[in-house]
Amino acid sequence: QVELRDPHANYNKMDRATLKKNFPTFDWDTYFTVSGLKDLEEVNIGQPAAMKEVADVINTVSLDDQKLYLQWGLIDAAASYLSDDFEAQNFDFYSRTMSGKKEMQPRWKRSVSTVDGVLGEVVGQMYVEKYFPAAAKERMVTLVKNLQTSLGERIKGLEWMSEPTKEKALEKLATFHVKIGYPDKWKDYSALEIKDDSYWANIERANEWDYNEMIAKAGKPVDKDEWLMTPQTVNAYYNPTTNEICFPAAILQPPFFDM
């Protein structure tokens, strides 16, 4: 757990040659080609020890057992989107037995949750249009900037903090990235095709779209304006990796806050 919380221990950048040298039992060329990353030159291996164990398992477990495991994984992931018997078994184990829930949510709630998960920023645009006008965002941005200024003045006046520490604190405050209400640029879902053929088929296409969006980021600079939450999410977050804080529109509504 200590190592998992250490950002330095989880940053192990390697080129392909080093990757093959450190984990020679894994077929990296095939992996990158099938994954759509054949031109990727460098990767970060968050946990090298775990990767070694995975490579060893792949080379010691029989191919039939690996296929069986992947088949089970697919069925397990799809269960809540299939017929009633699959859905009931999935709920009975994961929700009733493991979590103590008494009954399944009504279908309309489950459907809304799925749409919210797949088309989060489409729903977000509708939510913002109705509940969070641009003027509310501008007021909140001004409020946060005032708080940043006030915090900077407090840091400068702290008697117990050393000057080098103050400099670091002010440097961090100056690079603080604030996200308020909703993204300035919405996601483009035009490549995602929604059909009336089957629920699961739409989930598959949504997963493929999500995967392609993720793969398209490989080898490119981090988009610091990308949101990790949707505007309609009643929550907020601070991301220490990018030194950013995010307040979605929904958390800026009564009873939490009133713009």
Predicted segments, located by residue:
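Noncatalytic, helix-rich "gating/capping" subdomain that lines the substrate-entry/channel surface
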Residues: 1-142, 146
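Long, compositionally biased
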Residues: 9-19, 190-211
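Active-site-adjacent "gating/activation" loops or surface patches in catalytic cores
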Residues: 197-259
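Short amphipathic alpha-helical coiled-coil/interface segments
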Residues: 1, 140-151, 155, 169-180
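Amphipathic alpha-helical coiled-coil segments
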Residues: 157, 180-188
